[in-house]
Amino acid sequence: MIKYLIGIQVATALYLQFFQADEIFAPTLVLIHIIAGILVPIVYYGKSDIQNNKNQPVIITFVFALATGIGLMVAGVTGFGQLILGFHIISSLIFIIFAFQFLTFDFIKFILVTGALFIIVVIAGVKDWSAIDQENKIANFSPSPGSTQSGNYIKANKINRSARCGTSGCHPDIYQQWSQSAHRFSSFNNPFYKASVDYLLSTSDTTTVRWCGSCHDPVMLYSGLMVGTPDVDLPEAHAGITCEICHGIIDIPDITGNANYVLDSPIEYPFSHSKGMLAAVNRMLIRTKPEAHRKAMLQPLHKSETFCATCHKVSLDVPINHYKWLRGQDEYDAWQASGVSYNAVAAFYNPPQSLTCQSCHMAMEKSNDRGNDYQKVFGHFFPAANTALPSLTDLKNSEWINRTTRFLQDDRINIDIFGAIIDSELIAPLGDRLQVKPGQQVRFEVIVRTKKIGHTFPGGTIDSNEPWLEIVGTNQNGETFFSSGSIQPDKHVDPSAHFFRGVLLDGDGEFILKRNPHEWRTTLYNNSIPPGSADVIHYTWVVPSDFEEEINLIAKVNYRKFNRSITIHSLDELIDLPVVEMAKDAIVISRLEKTELANNAGMRYNDYGIAMLRQNNLEASRLAFENVTKLIPGYADGYVNMARVLIKEGKFNAAKFQLDKALDLKNNFPKAKYFLALISKITGDYKEAISLFKFVRETYPNDRAMLKDFGQTQYFAENWIDASLIYNDVLRIDPEDAETHYNLMLIHQKLGDIGQAKYHSEKYLKYKPDEQARSISQTARLRFPHANNEAQQVHSHQLIQTDWFSTLK
């Protein structure tokens, strides 16, 4: 008997050590190995010849092997457990050698038995043990594009077990982090989401909620609890995005977002759903053979940015809005097409190294959780901008609010009271003081630049998020002289303020203020700022004729998670959401003291030039970049930025001159080569343009803007096949690019491929904007003067002396 037990021990140990067992077979072998190990001493000491034998070495080695085995059951094989595993293997080998000397069985027969057992184990390992116990019912998730591996629903108790990950002794830190995240409260435990769904259900049919469910209520959706109107009182309706959902995603078919992923039921170790002693056995099996668990729960796709895109890239289509395809929030494409990803050759700014979503939103946190790397794990707080959830009465969590505040204030945004235009003259870059005279009209130039942000500012749902610019002028007693963007007594922000947001309109020209995107038809304006870019906001002020004292001019970028209208609509128990001051700048306005200008302000000029270029004020932009090249002559981007303006002005030779200067500073600078390629394309030198684009493409193969320029150049050169290949590369990056589908339609018409031309024509018509919707915007412009002002590409905000302060004079 004992030879068979030792044979089982050896066979299972060899397989576990040298073969990659799947997620079910591995823990099963571990369990067999442990049971055999427990039986060995029982049988061993039951033999009379052993009882009479006083061999100390065999007893010592066996006790050591048993002790280290028990140690592995307790500690697992991670960290210090690796050392225990080494001792366990060595002591077990020595025990077997000694056992041969004192046990009466045939060595050859033992080898044959062990070999046979090993072969049986190997054959068993080939079997597909990944079959899972799912409800035998074909699922219908439409209009969500999400799916399950089997095509069936998954039992809720298989994908709603986050607490087990935290209480099993394996991932308590990660579980606590997740418990304080928006992912935890994505479902009907989030009153803002619940109010949105309630309104959706009251204005549409019940199937539309499944479109929301794939990202917000995956436990409900994939377990079949969203077939009709969801029961929001079920525990599953409050599950959030669980561990098993994110880590159960095994494939992302494309990058169109909307939760277009494939979910698999988690592969479970034996006794996974047991309690008491058997639950302890389950935890022990995971600890002693975690490789299979790790392989199943952490796949390469989980570390990719496309994994995040599946829910943070959104579109609405006819089944949802009964209108047409519209692009919703899209953090992925904003990141992909930016300098943050190192994909955009023409980016104004790049971080020191490329960053992914996880770099910012899953930064490493200190932890002793099992599976930590050097006492660190990927953070699962998922910090962003949500201070609303931890402010709710039922969830009040100051630690969460403070953590989010620190994240928002971590150099994400820079604000700069750059200059003032007085009597048509720009006085800049300002230092700490500006001198004015009574009666003068002053236009302040306030620059806001995105810094440590990998997508547009703001991200997410730009219609409900509320970042804005607040300008306040106070006297030396702290009394307000003038302001723009202050919070009013009714808790709404001053409607004349400058907002960094998008205003969405429904078919009647009303603002979308109920988180009701299914009724969205067009956008009145979108004042968000791209990553690594800048905007300039203009404020006009007429200096009072009796102006005598100094004024402290303070500019702040504020952030409130939801505007007041959304809060009123969503909450039964109204609260005041926190306002986070993300960035601040200040100067003193004086009648007597002279203006102070700043030194070493080349990059401030660069930001101003970028902002003015985005507003198409080419002269102001060019003058700003001229100052950059004077103040920072070794900054190659300064000359490239000059060339950008000159190209838009049609001054191609002057632009080439600036680009040559940049190339003198940085040999083969891809950014300079790219703009030289654009000049060659515009002037009809297609051969030179193609050569330059090929050079740039070697460094930036995933730059969609560059590829579209390259493809169009090939089209102009009548290289239809080459143009087609390049444009198809663009679709690999963004399958929903309307412009690319249009150009491919033209190319296939030239090639005589009517089928492909028709295909791309249909895609173009699907993804292109609806020009007729502009009429809705015109109606809204007449009704909402402040929003109409914001919708102008270049506009200013008037600073008016407050009534109550003027009464003090």
Regions found by a protein language model. Name each.
Residues 1-134:
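Membrane-embedded alpha-helical bundles that constitute the cytochrome b-like, heme-associated redox core
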Residues 732, 738, 742-773:
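TPR/TPR-like (Sel1-like) alpha-helical repeat modules
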Residues 27, 127-156, 174-208, 225-531, ...:
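Primarily the internal scaffold of c-type cytochrome electron-transfer domains
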